[in-house]
Amino acid sequence: MIVLVGLPGAGKSTLAEALARRLPGARVLDKDKVRHVLFDPCDYTSAERDVVFAAMLDAARYHLGRDRIVVFDGLTFSRRSQVAAAEAVAHDAGAFVAVLVCDVPLEVAIARVEAADDHLAANRDAQVVRRVAAEMEEPSGDYLTLDMTSDPERLVDQAMAYVEELAGE
């Protein structure tokens, strides 16, 4: 399981897609797509968010039980408890967990969010980025921090090396 931690606009989706291309059979679980399937129109409430997160954990449990790698995308994992919930699912399935912290300056995340007018999450704006940044907790346990302003290919190589190390490949 790969858990991408970071602000909206950090580049988690770009990284998730690149990792999935290099990991045969990997499943990207995208929060925004799941939310739109379950709730359209979306109201972006905490209750809705909780249902979506639970559905993603269930989907992860299903795929991990079939020896597939799961990449969580679209979630900020701003709370340690969220990371812990994903880790528990992976551990129950006997799967590895690679926590990748997608680090980007606040100003860069805001600029990216404001420039992206085609994102599925209609609530993404500078205010949301600032709120998530204020709530962000450093994950406990092992993780790899990636500078999401650096070369994209280098980032994917770094992430893959970490994933392969944890997966025992």
What residue ranges belong to the model's regions?
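Hydrophobic anchor at the beta1->P-loop junction of P-loop NTPases
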Residues: 4
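P-loop (Walker A) phosphate-binding loop of NTP-binding proteins
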Residues: 7
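Conserved nucleotide-binding/hydrolysis micro-motifs of P-loop NTPases
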Residues: 33-35, 78, 103-108, 151-152
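Glycine-rich phosphate-binding loop used to anchor ATP phosphates in small-molecule kinases
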Residues: 48-97
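Small-molecule kinase domains that catalyze NTP-dependent phosphoryl transfer to phosphate-bearing small molecules
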Residues: 115-158, 166-169
